[in-house]
């Protein structure tokens, strides 16, 4: 019998759950709104009961709760979509329908009475305020108002690079756990894994080139992008080049920030892999490259999907198709860009097993 029976809310493709089975966790029920993401979840987690539909719909919510009760769910993981808090002001947060999704996590905690709850989101989430009982409170404050008699409520911002992931990706983590249990935070690793450690051995590729290595193929880039990035050194942005900078069709310079059209650094972790990680013009998206004898730089491209998989701590035997079209490649990148690196979620949750000496079933 599995020690944990988990409900995964707002699960997308379930990337954060990749290593759960390795530590004895069983996700028995999952819910995702978007059918394309739900289908991918079923591909990656065929043994989980995926209930596709809008959790705001009472029929869907009731089905999720009913199936969770049948399966004996004792843990909830929840990653509500965070787009609604990226650029809006405080009053707009209250009215953004996407932010109503947080309340369904609270409802599920009330209805299922789990022993553990794991909530993760963008760092800004911890400071965001909601209206609750005529007060403006953070989500953590609301959790304490509702559940502090039964649960310990804790939060931190953890960066994946501190826990063995070759990517700098800070995430807001909120934990709820019943007071008879322990759930410490994971300790930081002594060594940071760099891009040199992670992807140096992969062969160089230019625009449109394909290697014999699975998922190591370069998406095509424009001639202009290839030219400007081949004249941009490791760690630098083409926006600062005096001659070879991004241009519009009329020859004028493209407007952009200092971290656009920018190469990464070999001796640092990858910057955060966002959903647009295939775009040269995105933030810190370009391969570090290697200097050639003529002074130009190789790999004038974004990371290949294989490189994104590696820096996101996903396994190289991951269950996605071996061959992907460009559209499919970009969709998988989108899924990865939306997700917490799975090694980080594993290290956070396995602390329950370690701290309670794997005696969870006896408590």
What are these regions (language model features)?
Residues 9, 30, 163-167, 262, ...:
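Aromatic-acidic/polar surface patches that form glycan- and anion
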